[in-house]
Design a protein with these regions (language model features):
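Hydrophobic pocket-lining residues within nucleotide cofactor-binding pockets
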Residues: 57, 147, 204
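Short amphipathic coiled-coil heptad-repeat segments
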Residues: 1-16, 172-218
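Active-site/binding-pocket entry motifs
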Residues: 31, 57-60, 88-89, 107, ...
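Non-catalytic DNA-recognition/assembly elements of restriction-modification systems
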Residues: 4-35, 149, 153-157, 161, ...
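A short beta-sheet element
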Residues: 53, 72-125, 134-136, 143
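Amphipathic alpha-helical segments
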Residues: 17-23, 148-189
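Sequence-specific dsDNA recognition surfaces
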Residues: 23-41, 48-78
């Protein structure tokens, strides 16, 4: 039986299932903004507490540590949903060390009716739309009201959890295949270089006698 649909009222979302709801994010979640920590206390040595900067949301890695005073409200833990507020507005489910959240990054806090991982899958496309609608001659900046006004379409919590389980499984498989393909591409690129080098220095006939070129890397 085909599921009944209804208009979402949002042009880029289109129709949604009849039993789904749609609300602005400010009515079903909150945002914790990073702190403008004093860079005088930044270090590249792991003698302080890990600090998440905007570039780390893309990479998922930590390269900066903080040795000053801080409030625990700015702590980020594994499973938290983070958004970079400059550039491409990247989203990441944090899966690294517990860390502090620096300025120009934010943590998405969902209400009890929204699964955090569901939001992590949902937000990237919505933030892409925001990015496209944001005019700028330099780096684009995400504002507080931009996040609060994002329309969130969502089903009951148990269906959100089912959606997350499916996407976790499928995306893991896709990432694994992509990693294998990248390895194969690297091998093929190396073979291509070797083939070209071998052909332009040894010729087509591999049976002819060889002589020392006098150049170490040619042979």
């Amino acid at each position: 039986m085909t599921e009944q649909m209804k208009p979402s009222g949002i042009e880029w979302i289109g129709d949604i299932p009849n039993d789904w709801k749609i609300q602005r994010f400010k009515f079903c979640g909150a945002v914790l903004y990073g702190c403008p920590f004093n860079s005088d206390f930044f270090t590249n040595e792991d003698t302080g507490i890990p600090l998440i900067r905007i570039r780390d949301i893309t990479s998922g890695t930590i390269s900066t540590y903080y040795e000053g005073h801080y409030s625990s409200e700015y702590m980020v833990y594994s499973g938290d949903v983070l958004v970079g507020m400059d550039g491409d507005f990247n989203v990441r489910i944090w899966d690294n060390l517990d860390a502090l959240l620096n300025q120009r990054c934010c943590k998405i806090l969902s209400s009890k009716k929204i699964n955090a991982r569901y939001l992590a899958y949902y937000l990237p496309h919505q933030l892409y739309i925001v990015n496209q609608l944001t005019w700028s001659t330099t780096v684009k900046h995400l504002l507080a009201e931009d996040i609060g006004n994002i329309p969130v379409a969502y089903p009951q919590l148990n269906e959100q959890q089912a959606i997350v389980r499916l996407l976790d499984k499928e995306c893991t498989q896709i990432d694994s295949i992509a990693a294998d393909l990248e390895k194969q591409i690297a091998i093929l690129q190396q073979y291509k270089k070797s083939l070209i080098t071998e052909t332009v220095t040894k010729g087509l006939d591999k049976s002819v006698p060889m002589k020392d070129s006098g150049v170490e890397w040619i042979g």
